[in-house]
Amino acid sequence: MRPLIVIGNWKMNGSLANNQDWVKTVARGMESGMPSGRKYAVCPPFPYLQQCADLIKGHSLAFLSLGAQDASAYGSGVYTGEVAAAMLKEFGCTCVIVGHSERRQMHQEVDEVIASKALQVLDNSMTPVICVGETADERNSGRAQEIVCSQVAKQVGVLQDRLVDCLIAYEPVWAIGTGKVASAQVAQDMHRAIRLQLAEFNEDVASHVGILYGGSVKPDNAVELFAMPDIDGGLVGGASLSPQDFLAICKA
């Protein structure tokens, strides 16, 4: 059975003071116990990784893991501004987001680069969270599943059997940061299409890979989303900045 996974993506938010309050509040909320068979992680900006690692350890937060928002496609070398997966591993990261739509749009990242990043993450014994999704224009033209399944197929072509150690996050671009959200059934339909695309390669891999939903997940829609058979949790953006909302989603 696939575990339900909730990952908070702070994007370019946070501060030393706010991070302390966030972890303290989440620790207090998790003390009363969490639903069994679930996993949780938070991905702060790079400069806060050490602080958050120390805070998580200091509060004995066994339920919460540390993740990162990106990693370089290269192992080391003359790549100014890049952060290697091996460096993230040293901070205690267990998962790394790759291919987020904001990276695809703002930094022109293509599927081949994203697959290279995923390989770097895997080679350093962490879990890549590979993001896929369609724009509003692509959905309105009836090409949503075609676009997303093409993105998945390109990852399959590079990662092959190693996909079993990855997570996929479906993030409809039109729903990110807009307050819009795909209905639970629309999200389920896409998650099912992704799993069928994976099954064309390997049915066992398809049955084991967790597929998260990442489009404006909030406390008031998390229960319905997480009840869907092919939705295995959420990649949570804006709502993860509120420790109360993050806790509510984790317990949904």
From Swiss-Prot:
HAMAP family: TIM_B
Keywords: Cytoplasm, Gluconeogenesis, Glycolysis, Isomerase
Family statement drawn from the similarity comment of this UniProt entry: Belongs to the triosephosphate isomerase family.
GO molecular function: triose-phosphate isomerase activity
Broad EC category: isomerase
Protein name in the entry: Triosephosphate isomerase
CDD domains in UniProt: TIM
Protein function: Involved in the gluconeogenesis. Catalyzes stereospecifically the conversion of dihydroxyacetone phosphate (DHAP) to D-glyceraldehyde-3-phosphate (G3P).
InterPro entries: Aldolase_TIM, TIM_sf, TrioseP_Isoase_bac/euk, Triosephosphate_isomerase, Triosephosphate_isomerase_AS
Signal sequence annotation: none
E.C. code: 5.3.1.1
GO biological process: gluconeogenesis; glyceraldehyde-3-phosphate biosynthetic process; glycerol catabolic process; glycolytic process
Active site: 100 (electrophile), 171 (proton acceptor)
Domain of life: Bacteria
Gene Ontology terms: cellular component: cytosol
UniProt-listed Pfam families: TIM
